[in-house]
Amino acid sequence: MSGDHLHNDSQIEADFRLNDSHKHKDKHKDREHRHKEHKKDKDKDREKSKHSNSEHKDSEKKHKEKEKTKHKDGSSDKHKDKHKDRDKEKRKEEKIRAAGDAKIKKEKENGFSSPPRIKDEPEDDGYFAPPKEDIKPLKRPRDEDDADYKPKKIKTEDIKKEKKRKLEEEEDGKLKKPKNKDKDKKVAEPDNKKKKAKKEEEQKWKWWEEERYPEGIKWKFLEHKGPVFAPPYEPLPEGVKFYYDGKVMKLSPKAEEVATFFAKMLDHEYTTKEIFRKNFFKDWRKEMTNDEKNTITNLSKCDFTQMSQYFKAQSEARKQMSKEEKLKIKEENEKLLKEYGFCVMDNHRERIANFKIEPPGLFRGRGNHPKMGMLKRRIMPEDIIINCSKDAKVPSPPPGHKWKEVRHDNKVTWLVSWTENIQGSIKYIMLNPSSRIKGEKDWQKYETARRLKKCVDKIRNQYREDWKSKEMKVRQRAVALYFIDKLALRAGNEKEEGETADTVGCCSLRVEHINLHPELDGQEYVVEFDFPGKDSIRYYNKVPVEKRVFKNLQLFMENKQPEDDLFDRLNTGILNKHLQDLMEGLTAKVFRTYNASITLQQQLKELTAPDENVPAKILSYNRANRAVAILCNHQRAPPKTFEKSMMNLQSKIDAKKDQLADARKDLKSAKADAKVMKDAKTKKVVESKKKAVQRLEEQLMKLEVQATDREENKQIALGTSKLNYLDPRITVAWCKKWGVPIEKIYNKTQREKFAWAIDMTDEDYEF
């Protein structure tokens, strides 16, 4: 029985393949014949179609009965399938003729939908497929046998095509997905940036819009992680030797560490200064063992060359690091910043300015400091005082150590403090300049200076009257106050001899620091100042003064030696007390702030031209800023690369001039062509050349403005006055009034520092 079934199945399959080959050969001929006979047989085909539909309904009934019978019997009749396969071709031809060109619409009206049509593909046997526009889709109506008979081949082809279609769609989907992802990324990136910017904007603490704390209270809650200590000393490699008197000498770890501090500075001018060398050697010997002290008795016999070369090589290696190595270091620093660089103050995350404690090294000081070269010792946890709120988590000290003290003082702004060993001064870890505490302090400073504006005329009248006082102390105070007001001099603090550099302020002026000229350069009553100011920067100025001031100075200098104090009956304490009596909160610094800010405002009004472009306006701003820096004696040494950078800038200017000359020639030539041709095309060319010339002129102007700006400010430090003495609201108002982007005046850090001023100021602000 099973053998018969196998025989029947193989016979059916063979017949099927034979019929299938006949079908492909006759396919195109049948189509052509149908196309020709289409019009003649139209009515006949419709009748056949109707007849076919009625037959289809009958076949469906028969099919249902057969299906019921099959389910009851539990098997299918394979012999009947064999006869049906033999008659396949005949039925196929009848079905195609019956279908004809019957419309889909009509088929649906007859109560059934057409089965899926078989895709016709051109064969490789030399036949040409008829034009698509001439062929109407064929619908295969079902006859009485078609309901229960479907050739295996057709079914297999349909399934394969369906699978192929799905696979193609999936592949297309996979190919398209990256594009969609890229598009999504491109769309998402700006959205993410906007969201991030919006989130940052929301996170910014607009403390200036909140109610201020009671007087003296700085915060209500403060929590932080404490300081980051300098890494421990790493001994030098065995190959790096120290020589004393031409012989190799192995140093103890402590002595070696201090020796490396000197070796790192070997090429610096500091190591040639006698005071530096003397202080270093004295402190270095304190770190030596007894044997080392007995051996090393002369610094000149010490050879630090190999140490110095080793550190230079280390420095060069850091410069030559790969991107991956630099990125790794950057990530480590960012991780450290994230953990230690922020604190929580009154439920807001605030940036800490200097969370790393300075490593040990050699003290340099400002100017010719008498303690330069001394050893700055390593700061340990036992030196540290922590300040935080009582309900905050106290930062943990490094393992095996403890803090010197933990305080909960909300009347101070520092987080960590310690005492350094050189000057005995207290050092602090404070918040970033963009923090609320620093911002409030700045705001108060400028508001105090604005209050001075209301009473400055009264104060000036007062000190003018005091020039005539019978008391020498009052006269000296009045002249000193005149200098502080007119010249923006610092008050000058009293200093212990030998403890700090010999810098001078108003109250500490000596007779040797001034020269009096009844007439100089066509001006009367000129005072010539020449003294070391803050950071040992020389203050040199020739100033015409009022006659009574000049006469008083002559009086103050009578019978005095050059090293004697000019104001021998005055000190900073007496002066500051007098200033407080004149106005609450008034100090010499308030006078400097007032004069600096008012000078900037006046200079901007004088120098800014409404019709200037943005680069020219920026030059005007820098010139106004320069006037303030000169007033406050904010000088600097010209940068080492100044000459080279100016040469590079001049080369750019020369190249731009050549480009402009060529562009002007092109414009002239285009205008000549336009006169001859007189057509729209040449007119467009002329306009294009004009725009090119204008663009190059603007670029040249920018470069020339930049060169002028650099030259004028090569020895002037604009940043000091901009950050510390100029009310930022003056700058913000000027930018808003004249359409100058604030980014052109303040960098990102400065914008964060002055966020309060940028937010609250409009263009009508007056200091």
Swiss-Prot record:
SMART domains given in the database record: TOPEUc
Covalent cross-link Glycyl lysine isopeptide (Lys-Gly) (interchain with G-Cter in SUMO), where: 105, 119, 155
Biased composition (Basic and acidic residues): 1-23, 40-110, 131-168, 181-200
Biological processes, Gene Ontology terms: animal organ regeneration; cellular response to luteinizing hormone stimulus; chromatin remodeling; chromosome segregation; circadian regulation of gene expression; circadian rhythm; DNA replication; DNA topological change
Enzyme Commission number(s) from the entry: 5.6.2.1
Residues at the site labelled Interaction with DNA: 318, 366, 414, 445, 503, 534, 576, 634, 652
Chain residue ranges for the region called Interaction with DNA: 427-428, 490-495, 587-589
Isomerase is among the record's keywords: yes
Crosslink position(s): Glycyl lysine isopeptide (Lys-Gly) (interchain with G-Cter in SUMO1): 119
Enzyme class: isomerase
Other notes: Eukaryotic topoisomerase I and II can relax both negative and positive supercoils, whereas prokaryotic enzymes relax only negative supercoils.
Name the UniProt record assigns to this protein: DNA topoisomerase 1
Organism: Rattus norvegicus (Rat)
